[in-house]
């Protein structure tokens, strides 16, 4: 006998489940982001536990190239509190980012332009994997920051008037 093929399957796609673990709002203020890219990150077990508890700080982080690889530098992930100091990780260690070679080459060519840099924008869970959103951007000058603040305040005023 043939099996009943009319059964409806539930969509249990893990890729639709996103949980933001850390965000770098300062980078969006400090840089004019022109491009974003998703990257995996090579972590230790205690780092994963700390990140899931929300103990990651992306504010001072940036990316660098070494030996054909891209490294995440100066991102602080606090040591896990329930593990002894011998088994814990260094909070500011360099972490390798997992990208395809073509993506690394593209990012390297973008950063060779004057003033361009790669900064982490957010860290989130995608299924059971911890992913990082990287932004390629150029540092803003003081007058650019002031102009952005003016535009934000104008948008807020317009939205408040429209809600009335």
From Swiss-Prot:
Compositional bias (Basic and acidic residues): 145-158
GO MF annotation list: RNA binding
Keywords: Cytoplasm, RNA-binding
Main subcellular localisation: cytoplasm
Alphabetical list of PROSITE patterns matching this protein: SSRP
Gene3D superfamilies, sorted: 2.40.280.10
GO terms under cellular component: cytosol
Region (Disordered): 143-164
GO biological process: trans-translation
Top-level taxon in the UniProt lineage: Bacteria
Compartments in which it is found: Cytoplasm
Protein family (similarity comment): Belongs to the SmpB family.
Task of the protein: Required for rescue of stalled ribosomes mediated by trans-translation. Binds to transfer-messenger RNA (tmRNA), required for stable association of tmRNA with ribosomes. tmRNA and SmpB together mimic tRNA shape, replacing the anticodon stem-loop with SmpB. tmRNA is encoded by the ssrA gene; the 2 termini fold to resemble tRNA(Ala) and it encodes a 'tag peptide', a short internal open reading frame. During trans-translation Ala-aminoacylated tmRNA acts like a tRNA, entering the A-site of stalled ribosomes, displacing the stalled mRNA.
Annotated protein name in UniProt: SsrA-binding protein
Protein's organism: Prochlorococcus marinus (strain MIT 9312)
């Amino acid at each position: 006998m043939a099996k009943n093929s009319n059964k409806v399957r539930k969509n249990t796609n893990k890729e639709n489940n996103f949980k933001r673990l850390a965000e770098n709002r300062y980078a969006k203020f400090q840089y004019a982001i022109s491009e974003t890219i998703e990257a995996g990150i090579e972590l230790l077990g205690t780092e994963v536990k700390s990140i899931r508890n929300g103990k990651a700080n992306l504010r001072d982080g940036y990316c660098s190239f070494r030996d054909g690889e891209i490294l995440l530098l100066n991102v602080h992930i606090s040591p896990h509190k329930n593990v002894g100091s011998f088994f814990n990780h260094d909070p500011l260690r360099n972490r390798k980012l997992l990208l395809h070679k073509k993506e690394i080459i593209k990012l390297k060519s973008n950063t060779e332009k004057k003033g361009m840099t790669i900064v982490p924008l957010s860290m989130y869970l995608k299924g059971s994997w911890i992913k990082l959103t990287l932004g390629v951007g150029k540092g803003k000058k003081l007058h650019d920051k002031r102009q952005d603040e003016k535009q934000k305040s104008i948008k807020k005023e317009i939205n408040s008037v429209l809600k009335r």
